[in-house]
């Protein structure tokens, strides 16, 4: 079963948590869900060059807090913070309410599955050979501390007449193990020959405690540790 389902959905409530975190009263659920879809669609279009990994939406006390996880926060912020303020105003106007926009830097984009898939898609659109793009991304992930990596590309690879699927694996990716911290991301490369689909699984180790927020806490701790080591070196 672990081979078939989305690894993030399978681990929700075990060591992963939801990207939309709010409670809807009677008759409000559909409205809030459509707002979430519009917010994500708008941000992904506007920030397509900012390497956005995921967008978390929370709604405390009838407000809306949007947290964008990005590898390039400078692109989102803009000159003197002008771009992020414009985005915040547009989001507030779109949902007709107050919006707080926060940024979280992805410190290791090489082991973020969504960003790896996006990187491969961009390379394929630039006509880089698909095998080279897949191998390069896999080597970068393993070098940055991933325990295992699996990349699948499907479509008219190399401009072939007949579509096929190519797969590369390195290390272990235990999809059945619920305590395994597995990141999963997909992307589409729109090439002249047609669309090529990319799927990426990255195994980062095991999370032994039963904690839905464990993955986010580990990311935060690694960022703080890196900042401390930088200060000590200085």
UniProtKB/Swiss-Prot annotation:
Boundaries of every KH type-2 domain copy: 39-107
Pfam family, one: Ribosomal_S3_C
Disordered: region residues: 215-234
One annotated Gene Ontology cellular component of this protein: cytosolic small ribosomal subunit
Keyword list, A-Z: Ribonucleoprotein, Ribosomal protein, RNA-binding, rRNA-binding
Residues spanning the membrane: none
Alphabetized GO MF terms: mRNA binding; rRNA binding; structural constituent of ribosome
Compositionally skewed regions (Basic and acidic residues) per UniProt: 215-227
Gene3D superfamilies with a match to the protein in the record: 3.30.300.20, Ribosomal protein S3, C-terminal domain
HAMAP family cross-referenced by the UniProt entry: Ribosomal_uS3_B
Complex formation: Part of the 30S ribosomal subunit. Forms a tight complex with proteins S10 and S14.
Alphabetical list of PANTHER family matching this protein: 30S/40S RIBOSOMAL PROTEIN S3, SMALL RIBOSOMAL SUBUNIT PROTEIN US3C
Record's protein name: Small ribosomal subunit protein uS3
Organism name: Maricaulis maris (strain MCS10)
Gene giving rise to this polypeptide: rpsC
